[in-house]
Amino acid sequence: MSQTITLIKDKILSDNYFTLRNITYDLTRRNGEVIRHKREVYDRGNGATILLYNSTKKTVLLVRQFRVATWVNGNQDGMLIETCAGLLDNDEPEVCIRKEAIEETGYDVGEVRKIFELYMSPGGVTELIHFFIAEYHDSERASIGGGVEDEEIEVLELPFSRALEMVRSGEIRDGKTVLLLNYLQTSHLMD
């Protein structure tokens, strides 16, 4: 017998920016036992992220920006170094990530390649992130980047080896960024 889930109650606790819901459900275990659970679930929509790399120059493009959740959790200045990313907002993942790449980094890249999609914090957050990589070239620079009006984003072009060192030293602590840098390393695209 497989597990079955029965929704008992779905109550919205807050929908000011994203949606925080209180979910009550019964989980019927494989042995037939029914257990009632009550959990809060944060729904912020799905997202996409991309690591831009240049195999000739052996560099990657990352961004540095303020992330309030990290500040609340002890990151003194709230600044985080990460891959370009954004919420889908009803766009297809590739459409979203192309827009975000131009807005944040200023690069209008050619071919993008989807690597995988992952739940980053499935214990309480619904978000599914689509992961991409793309090679960038200086000729594809369309603007200075930096994000939209309410964002202040610094574009960082780093040697790939330096980015990997920054993961080890704790200067890069964003999960999606670490995953994509490790993917780039193990795929040997920078060899």
From Swiss-Prot:
Amino acids binding Mg(2+) 2: E100, E104, E151
GO molecular function terms noted in the UniProt entry: hydrolase activity, acting on acid anhydrides, in phosphorus-containing anhydrides; metal ion binding
Keyword Magnesium: yes
Keywords in alphabetical order: Hydrolase, Magnesium, Metal-binding
Domain called Nudix hydrolase: residue spans: 43-180
InterPro entries according to UniProt: NDP_pyrophosphatase, NUDIX_hydrolase-like_dom_sf, NUDIX_hydrolase_dom
Keyword Protease: no
SUPFAM superfamilies: Nudix
Recorded family membership: Belongs to the Nudix hydrolase family. NudK subfamily.
Full protein name: GDP-mannose pyrophosphatase
